[in-house]
Amino acid sequence: MWFKQVTPFRVFELPEKRYLDESLGNSWFTEPQGLDWFSEGFTHPTAFSDTAVFGAEKTMLIALKREEKVLPSEAIKYKLDEQIIKIQANEGRNVGRKEKQELRETIIDDLLPKALIKSSRTYGLFAGEWLFVDTANRRKAENLLTKLREALGGLPAQQPLTRQSPSALMTNWLLQGEAQGRFMLDFDVTLVG
């Protein structure tokens, strides 16, 4: 598995595989129930693994699964407009803002158990003193770290502090035609953003 974009965290106390597996097993993913908008928890990081942690060499792979219920706003608006037309036709009165909001909440409560589900996974890889999260989205990376901290009862970790952002540094390498340190440039590049 290749990570496409990475958010790194320096981990100061790496948990042991057995303890990590046991702790994440206690924070296992369950599907969103009833009126829940979403649910998240840890799951198998690979299709062939039956544990919460997949270990290889000196690395450990984990996965946080999130399922969100999706209710299109057009569907809610359509049902709300239907209800308002019925009230206006049957009772001969206009519907106020407060009553509209109550009707809207009732419609959402009725539709939520039947809503479509959007599923996603965020992967994390412990390697040495680092946790690499497979996302460039800071909020998703922090969410995985928060869930790890909740499951483990704490995990001292922080993002590395740099003098220059990695994207600006690598762009300069391309402009100069030469990389610094132990890096070297190849012939292909994909610029994003």
Q: Residue spans of the language-model regions?
A:
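Terminal interaction module
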Residues: 1-50, 59-71, 75-103, 112-114, ...
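C-terminal extracytoplasmic interaction modules
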Residues: 106
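Short glycine/threonine-rich beta-strand-turn micro-motifs
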Residues: 127-132
